Structures are given as C-alpha cells and as structure tokens.
Curated annotation (Swiss-Prot):
Gene Ontology CC: one annotated term: membrane
Tissues showing expression: Expressed in lymphoid tissues, primarily in B-cell areas. In the lymph nodes, strongly expressed in the cortex and in both primary and secondary follicles. In other lymphoid tissues, primarily found in the marginal zone of the spleen, the follicles in the Peyer's patches and the medulla of the thymus. Detected on resting splenic T-cells (at protein level). Also expressed in nonlymphoid tissues, such as lung and thymus, as well as, at very low levels, in kidney, liver, peritoneum and testis.
Alphabetical UniProt keywords: Adaptive immunity, B-cell activation, Cell membrane, Disulfide bond, Glycoprotein, Immunity, Immunoglobulin domain, Membrane, Signal, Transmembrane, Transmembrane helix
Positions on the Extracellular side per record topology: 47-277
Protein name: ICOS ligand
Cytoplasmic topological domain: 299-322
Stimuli inducing this protein: Up-regulated by TNF and LPS in nonlymphoid tissues.
Ig-like C2-type domain segment(s): 167-263
CDD domains reported for this sequence: IgV_B7-H2
Described function: Ligand for the T-cell-specific cell surface receptor ICOS. Acts as a costimulatory signal for T-cell proliferation and cytokine secretion; also induces B-cell proliferation and differentiation into plasma cells. Could play an important role in mediating local tissue responses to inflammatory conditions, as well as in modulating the secondary immune response by co-stimulating memory T-cell function. During pregnancy, may function to skew the cytokine of maternal T-cells toward immunoprotective Th2 phenotype.
C-alpha cells in the first residue's frame, strides 16, 4: 500500500520543477536546459548500498545534506518499497504510527523523533531477513502554507547475506579398481544462492561440471541449502575438494575428502579425530589403574609377616657367656 498525504500532492506525483520555481520558458534553452538535465541525472544516481547479515540490525541512511533543524509538526516522513508497493514505516504529525505498515515490518522498522528534528530521517531496521533484500525509498515532505513540498528523497539498496555451514563430504560405492566412486557435498543455511565447485587437489584444477549434479533450494528459514553429487572413475589416490562460494560475502568455504576411504563421512576434522582418540584412551587408562590397584592389595595380603627378634637374640647370647 502506498501512503498518500491528504489534501496534498501524493507520493507518486512530482510537480514540475518549472512550476515550483516559476522558471521562465527561456530557461529551457541552451545552458539552462543542460543544467536541468544534469541535475536530473545526479538525482537519479543518488542511491546507496548497505549490507547486513541475517538476524542483525541495520541503519538505512536518509539525512538532510544541510542538517537543518525541523519542526515535527510540519513534517511527513515515509519509508517504503516501490515494487511491489510496501509501507515500511512513516511519520505523520499527530497520527499514530504503524497502522498502515506492512505486517512483515511491524515492530521491526522505526524512526527516531529526536534525530528527525536534527535532519536525520534514517530507518532503523531490526532482525534483518532474506526478504529484506530490497530497494528502500525515503521521502520527506514539509508542509508550507499552500502545499506539501518534497525536501528529501533517498534510495537505499539493502543486500542481505548469511554464512553457509562448513561443507560435509561423504563417499559411497566401492573403491576397487574399475568401479565408480560417488562423492556428495552438502552445505546449509546460507544466503544468497551459492556457487559450488569441485576441485582436484592433485593439480588444483576444477572438475568438469558435466560430472556433477548440483541442487539448490530454499529451506523453511528462507535460506539456501545446496547439495552436490560428483561421480568419478576410481583412482588409487586423488583427493577432491568441495568449495561453496558466497558471492555477497566474498567468501569460500571448503572441505576435503580422501579417496582411499570407503564409505561414510570423510570430511577431515582434526578436532573430531582428537576427541575420538580421547574416548578410546581414557577407558584404557582407567582399566590399567584398576588392575594395578588390585595387584597391590593382593600383594599386601599374601606377603608373610615376620617378627623382629634381633635385640632379644643378642641379649640371650650375653647371658650365656656370663
């Protein structure tokens, strides 16, 4: 829904510049026409781009370049998405905000009244979602004695991203000569849609895409999951690398799988290997300690008890000689 100012010019209507400024017809020839066209090009290119991670908060800037002070009783501020028309938030004098706001932005977008008095009409957007990848338009109008004049318009393109999980690689089928080996790589909960590559680590070359089958789909969170299946002829040695690329974050996440493993999850994880070793070592040490303790108890019980008679013997010998 596109909001309209009652009894004034609607948001989608632009009053001609020559009517607002009362410019004579001679202005549209020569230098005057050139300057007008130049100003139109500059206005059309006034677009900024902002990046945000899913679940984070972001500020979409809309600031008066002159940083003038404003009386809120004469201001009308609108933040909306143009195509399709979606009302994000707005400020109307003496009106309760949020009544006509789209349900997906209720309690997520707000304006600061104190900041608006200083010429800062920025949108504070909470809990960013993938669906917020949009162009947001800020329009500020000031009420004069006769009309509502637009004093500021900004377009902000929001690009949303989310990190993909570390790829998990598994292999199946026999690793015997003459048979085919199948690799599967899976990564979840990223945004936007990723690129996935398989790399031969022997020479760091990209593996032919004809040998792989990639499937990308949106999950219930609105994020992307990707799964890829790669089929290669058997080789005695030849590790492969699965690489998931997030273009928005300029990020590559990789995992390596060894060809000599037969089945199961072959993604190398040093921490997991260390934990498995500890799980085996601790019980063995406990058994050895218990066996040593039992042996010590048995030894103490079976050792013969002898009396110490040395001094008595010496005393007896002295008595006989006497």
């Amino acid at each position: 829904m596109q909001l309209k100012c009652p009894c004034f010019v609607s948001l989608g209507t632009r009053q001609p510049v020559w009517k607002k400024l009362h410019v004579s017809s001679g202005f549209f020839s020569g230098l005057g026409l050139f300057l007008l066209l130049l100003s139109s090009l500059c206005a059309a290119s006034a677009e900024t781009e902002v990046g945000a991670m899913v679940g984070s908060n972001v500020v979409l800037s809309c600031i008066d370049p002159h940083r003038r002070h404003f009386n809120l009783s004469g201001l009308y501020v609108y933040w909306q998405i143009e195509n399709p028309e979606v009302s994000v938030t707005y400020y109307l004098p003496y009106k309760s905000p949020g009544i006509n706001v789209d349900s997906s932005y209720k309690n997520r977008g707000h304006l600061s009244l104190d900041s608006m008095k200083q010429g800062n009409f920025s949108l504070y957007l909470k809990n960013v979602t993938p669906q917020d990848t949009q162009e947001f338009t800020c329009r500020v109008f000031m009420n004069t004695a006769t009309e509502l004049v637009k004093i500021l318009e900004e377009v902000v393109r929001l690009r949303v991203a989310a990190n993909f999980s570390t790829p998990v690689i598994s292999t199946s089928d026999s690793s015997n000569p003459g048979q085919e080996r199948t690799y599967t790589c899976m990564s979840k909960n990223g945004y936007p849609e990723p690129n996935l590559y398989w790399i031969n680590t022997t020479d760091n070359s990209l593996i032919d895409t004809a040998l792989q089958n990639n499937t990308v789909y949106l999950n219930k969170l609105g994020l992307y999951d990707v799964i890829s299946t790669l089929r290669l002829p058997w080789t005695s040695r030849g590790d492969v690398l699965c690489c998931v690329e997030n273009v928005a974050l300029h990020q590559n996440i990789t995992s390596i799988s060894q060809a000599e493993s037969f089945t199961g999850n072959n993604t190398k994880n040093p921490q997991e290997t260390h934990n498995n070793e500890l799980k085996v070592l601790v019980p063995v040490l406990a058994v050895l300690a218990a066996a040593a303790f039992v042996s010590f108890i048995i030894y103490r019980r079976t050792r013969p008890h002898r009396s110490y008679t040395g001094p008595k013997t010496v005393q007896l010998e002295l008595t006989d000689h006497a």
